[in-house]
Amino acid sequence: HLLQFNKMIKFETRKNAIPFYAFYGCYCGWGGRGRPKDATDRCCFVHDCCYGKLAKCNTKWDIYRYSLKSGYITCGKGTWCEEQICECDRVAAECLRRSLSTYKYGYMFYPDSRCRGPSETC
């Protein structure tokens, strides 16, 4: 669920998804095209690919079980879809934390029109 993903991002990075990640680069937020701009944008690209493998699931709105304890995100038991969506979100949030040192404020509200070239394949 998008609100759960936002909480994971905040837990890992101490930044709110909106505004820091919702419009970042070419892949953070809705959709994406071209090449990822940096490590942060690549986290979002990989997250999009992860969701892409779950076409039968309601990736944006399914509510899943998870916990935020002792510095770790742990996904809980649920339906296959819930567990997979949680894992996609957990891995992405951890990736965003690892990419904090190269976060560029210039990519924060990056216009889609500047995302050119062939899109990478998952």
Swiss-Prot record:
- What does the record say about how the cofactor binds? Binds 1 Ca(2+) ion.
**One Pfam entry name:** Phospholip_A2_1
Subunit composition?
Heterodimer of one of the acidic (CA1, CA2, CA3 or CA4) and one of the basic (CBa1, CBa2, CBb, CBc or CBd) subunits; non-covalently linked. The acidic subunit is non-toxic, without enzymatic activity and comprises 3 peptides that are cross-linked by 5 disulfide bridges. The basic subunit is toxic, has phospholipase A2 activity and is composed of a single chain.
Return the annotated site residues (Putative interfacial binding surface (IBS)): L2, L3, K7, K10, A17, A22, F23, K60, Y103
Where in the chain is the site Responsible for the weak stability and toxicity? H1
- State what protein this is by name: Phospholipase A2 crotoxin basic subunit CBd
Which transformation does this protein catalyse, written as a reaction? a 1,2-diacyl-sn-glycero-3-phosphocholine + H2O = a 1-acyl-sn-glycero-3-phosphocholine + a fatty acid + H(+)
Of the GO CC terms on this record, one is: extracellular region
Where is this protein found? Secreted
Q: Which InterPro entries match?
A: PLipase_A2, PLipase_A2_Asp_AS, PLipase_A2_dom, PLipase_A2_dom_sf, PLipase_A2_His_AS
Recorded source organism is Crotalus durissus terrificus (South American rattlesnake)
Organs and tissues of expression: Expressed by the venom gland.
Q: Which domain of life is it from?
A: Eukaryota
Cysteine-cysteine disulfides: C26-C115, C28-C44, C43-C95, C49-C122, C50-C88, C57-C81, C75-C86
Record's CDD domains? PLA2c
Listed EC numbers: 3.1.1.4
The record makes one more remark, namely: The crotoxin heterodimer is inhibited by the crotoxin inhibitor from Crotalus serum (CICS). CICS neutralizes the lethal potency of crotoxin and inhibits its PLA2 activity. CICS only binds tightly to the CB subunit and induces the dissociation of the heterodimer. Tested on the CA2-CBd heterodimer.
* Active site feature: H47, D89
Cited SMART domains: PA2c
Q: What class of enzyme is it?
A: hydrolase
Q: What is the lineage of its organism?
A: Eukaryota, Metazoa, Chordata, Craniata, Vertebrata
Per UniProt, Ca(2+) binds at Y27, G29, G31, D48
